[in-house]
From Swiss-Prot:
GO terms for molecular function: ATP binding; UMP kinase activity. This is Uridylate kinase. InterPro entries: AceGlu_kinase-like_sf (IPR036393), Asp/Glu/Uridylate_kinase (IPR001048), Uridylate_kinase (IPR011817), Uridylate_kinase_bac (IPR015963). It is an enzyme of class 2 (transferase).
Length: 244
């Protein structure tokens, strides 16, 4: 894949990548698929090789979904905390694979776990990124009733990122589920307001609202296609941009 050699030619120089837990399990029903995680790590390395500063927020849905557990009777706050622990497992797994490729990586958790990763401290996270280390944010926001999408938006804003890249199972935002509706319309660009008004399920409303308030653009794309992250950051490939 041909890369842009001059970082100054790129509009976005500091990015946050949101990776769902489901993306890490590949074709499995649960857990991790190593080859899939390795491909994601290789894709991230391509972005680093462009000279960008990279942060990541990872979900935990491949291991545990707090909202689903709450639906069957578990206390929602307790279920969400378990889900946060799942994101730490995923972050450590991704870190291990990335470091095997020579990528300097740090995991910072919103829930302190001193034996396995660093606690989230904003200044420390920014310093890691300045040193070209990839920072993986785990533990969501550290609070129940908040999604990892909300955590991704908050961390992107705190790190002064230029854009949030949301890696999904489809190649952008549609007016309905393209897996169920073959005639679903895809948007190349769409406003925050239209995402909220049309109840599009790309992110929860709170996350979109915070992104809008802070003018953080969001680019939605498919993580299934190898090399897609670097293409998308260079305005190539298939994606949808959410902005004002």
């Amino acid at each position: 894949m041909k890369m842009v050699s001059d970082i100054n030619a790129l509009k976005y120089k500091k990015v946050l990548l949101k990776v769902s837990g489901e993306a890490l399990m590949g074709n499995k029903q649960f857990g991790h698929e190593y080859e899939v995680i390795k491909k994601i790590a290789e894709d991230i390395k391509e972005v680093i090789d462009l000279g960008l500063e990279v942060a990541i927020v990872v979900g935990g849905g491949n291991i545990y979904r707090g909202i689903n557990a709450a639906l069957v009777g578990m206390d929602r706050a307790s279920a969400d905390y378990i889900g946060m622990l799942a994101t730490v497992i995923n972050a450590l797994t991704l870190q291990n694979v990335m470091e095997s490729l020579g990528i300097y990586t740090r995991v910072l958790s919103a829930i302190p776990m001193m034996s396995v990763c660093e606690p989230y401290i904003r200044r420390k996270a920014k310093r890691h990124m300045e040193k070209k280390r990839v920072v993986i944010f785990a533990g969501g926001t550290g609070n129940p009733f908040c999604t990892t999408d909300s955590a991704a938006v908050l961390r992107a804003i705190e790190m002064n990122c230029d854009i949030l890249l949301k890696a999904t199972q489809v190649d952008g935002v549609y007016d309905s589920d393209p897996k169920k509706n073959p005639n679903a319309k895809k948007y190349f660009t769409i406003s925050y307001k239209d995402v909220i008004t049309n109840h599009l399920q790309v992110m929860d409303t709170a996350a979109i609202a915070v992104a809008r308030e802070n003018k953080l653009p969001i680019r939605v794309f498919s993580i299934k296609e190898h090399g897609n992250i670097a293409r998308v950051i260079q305005n190539k490939g298939k994606y949808t941009t959410i902005e004002e």
